[in-house]
From Swiss-Prot:
It catalyses: L-seryl-[protein] + ATP = 3-O-(5'-adenylyl)-L-seryl-[protein] + diphosphate; L-threonyl-[protein] + ATP = 3-O-(5'-adenylyl)-L-threonyl-[protein] + diphosphate; L-tyrosyl-[protein] + ATP = O-(5'-adenylyl)-L-tyrosyl-[protein] + diphosphate; L-histidyl-[protein] + UTP = N(tele)-(5'-uridylyl)-L-histidyl-[protein] + diphosphate. ATP binds at residues 87, 89-90, 110, 122-123, 173, 180, 259. The keyword Protein biosynthesis does not apply. Its cofactor is Mg(2+); Mn(2+). Mg(2+) binds at residues 250, 259. Belongs to the SELO family. The active site is at residue 249. InterPro entries: SelO. It holds the Pfam family SelO. Keywords: ATP-binding, Magnesium, Manganese, Metal-binding, Nucleotide-binding, Nucleotidyltransferase, Transferase. GO terms for molecular function: AMPylase activity; ATP binding; magnesium ion binding. Its EC number is 2.7.7.-, 2.7.7.108. This is Protein nucleotidyltransferase YdiU.
């Protein structure tokens, strides 16, 4: 007997006034282009769910029993300014799938048509942006970074007008929750404190049930949100990921990555890297992300000020920097091959990063090559990458000396370092190549890239071309917010 997912929509049942009910608006000539087999397996969906009769679900043409589609309302700060009411302008929450382990997963259809919150938009998504989000969310997941996931890509013959005419598409996004900082801001700025508390109680009962009824449940919950967000920033910084649009309406209350737009991974190590060509002031530059996340948490704290005292809010927010520094320190030590802490570790890290800045070295390649270092060999696989050999040799001498303090052998250390230093990341030019071919109905590059990204830390000789340094044109792609 075929497995039938069990759906609910607690958001619809428990949070009246927080959404608008509506049906998805199908695209003309919609067809399933691609899906994530690993995610499908996690959701209990076999191959039959991705054959022609079932395509209607992924294309917004049919609903499964228990689904109650709705668009959520929220507000937010965008580029540091209060933007007022926003909401799901082109996405519809179809329902929540109950998994065998008791968890619930939102099914959210992006590009599903106009909603009351579309503002000046058309409610649609283009194939280009759908493929980028699919690949990015799958890439971050396999890098071990908390993120929403992407299950299906639907393409169509429906023309969508952006800077040029593009194909309309839909993405089925999966996450434990789509609640954002901006949900709380919306009701706070509308002077609806009961709704703020109602939403907080819903989130705590759903995702932090251990604190229901606790005298300080709101402080404990907010502190965990702060710490989760801090750890997420540490993950982003260590892999060289820039989100690009860290508005409060794009910040998850669960501390996961969501709302992929003009994101980018570092090629050359440029701390001030700006991936969004609309970010003229560099607010969301790579090296500014941890500070912006804290600013956003302060905005969330302000929205929650009716639930906690000022001292409780401050105490929760003060957990951010220690959580960030601990997580970042642990992850960067792992990238350097250090199991134990040492007073010289930070100098060695900043020394290497300074060399990379000075010579424009590739972030991912440098750390991956570092994983091949042999402690007792004066020859480094990295040396030929640097022009200033004297400066590198001085750093490398100190680095080898530090490695000799570790209690594991080369093989063990190299394996642990490779598990912290990916070989394959989603470079913008690789995503663009996959998009270009998919727009011609050739999904082989998309499929191949997706396959490589599922094992980013493993040497896969058949995908060596996907680990190569980008061509010059590939380093300077400007990514638009239009999607």
């Amino acid at each position: 007997m075929e497995y039938a997912p069990e759906f609910d929509n607690s958001y619809a049942r428990q949070l009246s006034g927080f959404y608008t009910r509506l049906q998805p608006t199908p695209l003309k000539g919609a067809r399933l282009l691609y899906h994530s087999k690993p995610l499908a397996q996690e959701l209990g969906l076999d191959a039959h769910w991705f054959t022609e009769p079932k395509t209607a679900v992924w294309a917004g043409e049919a609903l499964l029993p228990g689904m109650e589609p709705l668009a959520q309302v929220y507000s937010g700060h965008q580029f540091g300014m209060w933007a007022g009411q926003l909401g799901d302008g082109r996405g519809i929450l179809l329902g929540e799938q109950r998994l065998n382990d008791g968890r619930y997963m939102d099914w959210h259809l992006k590009g599903a048509g106009l909603t009351p919150y579309s503002r000046m938009g058309d409610g649609r998504a283009v194939l280009r942006s759908v493929i980028r989000e699919f690949l990015a969310s799958e890439a971050l997941h396999h890098l071990g970074i908390p993120t929403s996931r992407a299950l299906t890509i639907v393409t169509s013959d429906h023309p969508i007008y952006r800077e040029q005419t593009e194909r309309g598409a839909m993405l089925l996004r999966v996450a434990e929750s789509h609640i954002r900082f901006g949900h709380f801001e919306h009701f706070y700025y509308r002077q609806q404190p009961k709704q703020v508390q109602q939403l907080a109680d819903y989130v705590i009962a759903r995702h932090w049930p251990q604190w229901v009824g606790h005298q300080e449940c709101y402080r404990l919950w907010f502190t965990d949100v702060v710490e989760r967000t801090a750890r997420l920033m540490a993950h982003w910084q260590t892999v060289g990921f820039a989100h690009g649009v860290m508005n409060t309406d794009n910040m998850s209350i669960l501390g996961i990555t969501m709302d992929y737009g003009p994101f980018g991974f570092l090629d050359d190590y440029v701390p001030g890297y700006i991936c969004n060509h609309s970010d003229h002031q560099g607010r969301y530059a790579y090296d500014n992300q941890p500070a912006v996340a804290l600013w956003n948490l302060h905005r969330l704290g302000h929205a929650l000020s009716g639930l906690m005292s000022a001292d409780q809010l401050q105490l929760a927010l003060e957990a951010y920097e220690p959580a960030l520094m601990v997580a970042y320190g642990e992850q960067m030590r792992a990238k350097l091959g250090f199991l134990e802490r040492d007073s010289q570790d930070n100098d060695l890290l900043t020394g290497l990063l300074s060399l990379m800045i000075k010579e424009g070295r590739d972030y991912t390649r440098t750390f991956r090559l570092l994983s091949e270092v042999e402690v007792h060999s004066a020859q480094s696989p990295l040396r030929d990458d640097f022009i200033d050999r004297a400066a590198f040799d001085d750093w490398y001498r100190r680095y080898r000396s530090r490695l000799q303090q570790e209690s594991i052998d080369d093989d063990q250390r190299q394996q642990s370092m490779k598990a912290a230093n990916p070989k394959y990341i989603l470079r913008n030019y690789l995503a663009q190549q996959a998009i270009t071919q998919a727009e011609k109905d050739d999904i082989q590059p998309l499929q191949r890239l997706h396959q490589a990204l599922q094992q980013p830390f493993t040497d896969q000789p058949e995908f060596d071309d996907l680990a190569a340094l980008p061509p010059d044109w590939g380093k300077h792609l400007e990514i638009s917010c239009s999607s």
